[in-house]
Every structure is written in C-alpha cells, then in structure tokens.
Amino acid sequence: MELIPLIRDKSRLSDFLKDIPNDPGCYLMKDGEDRLLYVGKSKKLRNRVRSYFRSGNELSPRISLMVRQVADIELIVTDNESEALTLESNLIKSHQPYFNVLLKDDKKYPYVCITWGDKYPRIFLTRKRRQRQLKDKYYGPYVDVYLLRKTLFSIKKLFPLRQRRIPLYKDRTCLNYSIGRCPGVCQEEISSEDYKNTLKRVEMIFQGRTDELRILLEKQMISFSESLKFEEAGSVRDQLKGIDRLYESQKMIIPDSSVCRDIIAMASEENISSVQIFQMRSGKLIGRLGYFSDNSNFNSSQILQQVIENHYSNVDPVEIPSEILVQHQLVNNILISDWLSEIKKQKVNINVPKRSRKAEIIKLVEKNANLELQRIKQSHDKNLVELDDLTNILDLENIPKRIECYDISHIQGSDAVASQVVFIDGIAARQHYRRYKIKSPNIKIGHSDDFESMAEVITRRFRRWARFKEEGGDINALLSNQSSVLDNLNLNDWPDLVVIDGGKGQLSSVVAALEELKLDQNLNVISLAKKKEEVFIPNVKQSLVTESNQPGMLLLRRLRDEAHRFAITFHRQKRSQRMKRSQLNEIPGLGPQRIKLLLEHFRSIEAIQMATFSELSSTPGLGRSTAVVIRNYFHPDKNK
C-alpha cells in the first residue's frame, strides 16, 4: 500500500515525531513508493528531524519540495556523531539519493576513470559516472579540461596502455601495438596482472604520489641495468623524464614542501557557490578540482564541510593529505578531522590560516573560485536572456525549460532518419538525444516525403503521452505535480516547446499528427524554415516578425543546427553501413549471416579486401571455399 506524505497525515506525523530518540544517528527520508529521497545525520536526531516539519521554519525551495514527498522516515542510532558521519557517507555513496545531490559537478568538470573491473582496465576522460560499474575508480573533477587532456595524452605515450574500447581486429593486434603504445591486450600479449601493475603506476600520478613513483621507477631502472636489460632500462628512463615534464612548468611552491596539502576555498553569489580544491604535493600544484553548490539554506561553513565530506568519501585513503587548509572554520571541524584521520590511519589536520604564505594561497584559491563562478554566471545569464527573448517572440506563458528540435535527413528518400535534440535551460542535454529510423513503407529510394517522415517521428515520440491521456490522465495536472509520479509513470520528458526544422508544410503535418493523438492543445509547436530563418506557428499563414540577431533567434538557430548535425551524422553512418553490405551482397554465395560474420570479424570492407586467404578461411563460420570466392572477388588478377 502506498503511504501518503507525512505532511498531509498530521496524526501519523505527530505520533512519529513524539517517539524519535535524541541520540546521534542517521535519518533516511522516503517517499510513498519507499524510494530513498534523502539521507541526513545529526548529533540529536529528534531536534533535527522535527526541524523539517516545524511551522514557521523557513526551508529552501529544494528542501520544501522534498518534505512534501516524505511519507516515511527510517532512523539508525549510532554510538557517537563520528559513526553517524561515516554511516551517512556510506549510505549516500551506495544509494545516491536525489536530494543529497548538493554538489553539481557532474557535467561541468570531467573526471579520469579507470575501469578496474575489466580484465584489462581502460583509462579515459568522462563527465558522467557509470552507476552500475562499482569497481570503476574516478579522479577529479578537474577544472582545467585542456590540461587534463594533455596530461592523459602524455601518459598514454609514456606507458603502454589499452587504447581502444573495442578491439580493431579479432585475430591480430593493431598499429598501436607495433609502435609501443599498447601492450597488445586484445590478443593477450601481456598478462592481466602485469598490465594492471603498469596501470597502478599511472594511477599514482592521479593520486599525487609522483615522488613514490619516481623512487619505484628509479629502482626498476637500476635493476634492469644491472641485469644488462638496457632497452628496458631506457624505456623506464624515458618514463621518468616524461613524468618530470608533466610538472616542469609548475612553479607554485608553499612552505614545508614535503607536506601534502589540499587548499579549499569558495566564492558565492545569490544561490550558487563555486568551490575549488588545489592539490599540493611536495610543494607543487598537481591538481585543481571544482564543485558547484546550491547555497540556498546553507552558509559557507556548511558548504565547505559538505564538499569535504563528499570529496574525501570518494577517494582512496592514500589520496587524503596530511593537512587541509580551509577558508572558513567548519561546522564540525574536530569531527571531520577525526573522521578523515580514521580513514587515512594517520593524523589529518584541518586549519584556517590567518597569516603567512598559507593565507595568501587561500586567497589565491578563492580568486580562482570567483573567476569560475563569474564564468558560469555569465553563461547562465546569456542563456536566460535568450530564453526570455524567445518567450516574448513566441508569446509563451512561461520560459521554456525543456526544448526539443526535430530534423529529417536522407538522400532522395534513401536511409531516411530523424534526430531529436534537447536543450534544457538553453544548454544541450545530450543524454536526452534520440535517433529514429524512418519506418514508413512509403519512404524509399527515389521517393522522399519529409512531411510524412516528421509526422511518423512525432507520433512515435508522444505515443506514451497520448495513451496516458486516453486512459483519463490529466497532463496539465500531472506536470504541475512535481513529485515522483512523473518518474513512476515514465512520463518525465514533456517538452515546453517543440521546434521543427522546416517550413509551413512540415509544421502542418506535425500539428495534424498531434491532433490525431489529441495532444495539439497541450504542446507548444513551431517551425524554423532554413532559407530565410522564418518562424512559423500553427494556424498563422505569415511568419513571425523577428530580427536575425536577436537573442531568441540565436538560440533557435543553435538548436536547429545541432539537430541537423545530429541527423546528418546518423544518416551518414547508416548509409555507410548499407554501402558496405551492398558491396558484399555482390559476392556470390554470401548471404546476410555470413556478411554479418565478416563485418563483425574484420570491422571494415577495407580490412576484408586486404585480408589474406589464410585470414579469410580461419574466420569462424566462413570456410575455405567461401574464402576463395571472396579473395577472387577483390583480387581477380591474382586468381589462379
């Protein structure tokens, strides 16, 4: 049975609040579907939990939204506040509750990921954590993307590492192995254990343990030299020189350079804060990490503490420095220090420097945080101006948060595809992009129909919503209820505006499709014609009067161009696949199954063409006679 929110069940709420113990511990807030919304900790559970429901208590919009959904609260009592902190950290890490995401770093700054769960792990740059891959290890988030890419490129030149997600060939190594960039993991030319040992050395660079790595490599170089393995010794020497080059431009030195320190400072404006972490190891700046935070209902000390809890709960204990310099005194300075010391198994000091060089570095980190804050605010303000202007152009009731744009791509009807791109708050949200293969039997080579294609795509896109409405659902009421109901019904993708790449004809076909779905009164739909950049709205013959350089039009063009790029990329990919298959279809005796086997094994027509008879005949499921036919087709002059 689904529980109703506590805030609407005064009797149950009153009974629950009376029985809360005033001990240290954690509280887990859940919605009516038993989904975890929020995990919190407190020295006194009763006082903290009651504060959420106390009348007259001003909560931030984010927390107010959460409280309206809370239907059950689970309590876990601990012996002390330190245990509560550790438990909270573990619960957040395990469950990733929606309302615990105070820090907004996922899409702004990249991480370095090492896939330790693989037999031969990869190392790559990413902006998104893979939730299901628990053995993945992440380093970051790094502020300087250019420097991170450069560092990763240099590391892959210094150490032979796996270069590809999918092997280029199934039965042989590629060029990367020949030039020493890869140890031949696809053919298991190196054992998994030896490869992981190499990667552990690379990991030490991102952990800031370059001094340890240098000592390790120097010992190995001497060992190789004494064993007269001069080529191996030279390779290790080159790695040592390369590591030195990675940091040779780093001149920032702080007192007691033998000590490892992280310096953390922040800058705030309105409801957003930028937090920067400078990682100093052996007197050198080896990393600059960044977070953004919603600071409504939080002061500077709370935000800094939240950053520290979040960041250090996700790193290896060896990466925790012996000293952390912070801009403001933390809410629970001693508690956090003891917690980190317990994880590291070594004393960790958290200090607020007031004078000397350390205080100057805090100011420098604060300055960098402020620069990053202004950069983000400037981008946000620009997007807001564009969205506001677009709202005025189209006479919309509200600023469109989610905008979708659709485009069709084909060549005279062949390989017809469509794209759906999504902008949220004026920014491309690539995780929501979709591609469609046009399925209508009327669309074929020599016969194109953009109107029918667009109608098909829109019908497929909004079919779920039409079914919901047909079953008696109220779309407007559903959208106004910002609860977990949308996610539960898999109806969390309603756009505030739909943009069609095309003119009046394409717009009319889309409106007709929406009328058939009975959604024409719910959706805002427009079209943008390429030739004169004209904007059309339903049931109006003339285009809207606009200026080409006004902010709203710039946003529409950027959206349309992105939809076109995404559609044409998919079209080229599909056409390339068809052309590969069509060439192989000309070879006598090759059916669809064998064509599929060939392409899976060799990856390209060029590779099949270059393959020897031995390579062809050893392809699983092919056989010698078929290999002869393929070889003769591509090399008729060598036919004996």
Swiss-Prot record:
Keyword DNA repair: yes
PANTHER family recorded: UVRABC SYSTEM PROTEIN C (PTHR30562:SF1), UVRC/OXIDOREDUCTASE (PTHR30562)
Gene Ontology CC: cytoplasm; excinuclease repair complex
GO biological process: nucleotide-excision repair; SOS response
Homology family: Belongs to the UvrC family.
Molecular-function annotations in GO: DNA binding; excinuclease ABC activity
Magnesium recorded as keyword: no
Database matches in HAMAP family: UvrC
UniProt domain GIY-YIG: residue ranges: 22-101
UniProt function note: The UvrABC repair system catalyzes the recognition and processing of DNA lesions. UvrC both incises the 5' and 3' sides of the lesion. The N-terminal half is responsible for the 3' incision and the C-terminal half is responsible for the 5' incision.
Main location: cytoplasm
Protein name according to UniProt: UvrABC system protein C
Assembly information from the UniProt record: Interacts with UvrB in an incision complex.
Lineage summary: Bacteria, Bacillati, Cyanobacteriota, Cyanophyceae, Synechococcales
Protein encoded by which gene: uvrC
Domain UVR positions: 211-246
Organism: Prochlorococcus marinus (strain NATL1A)
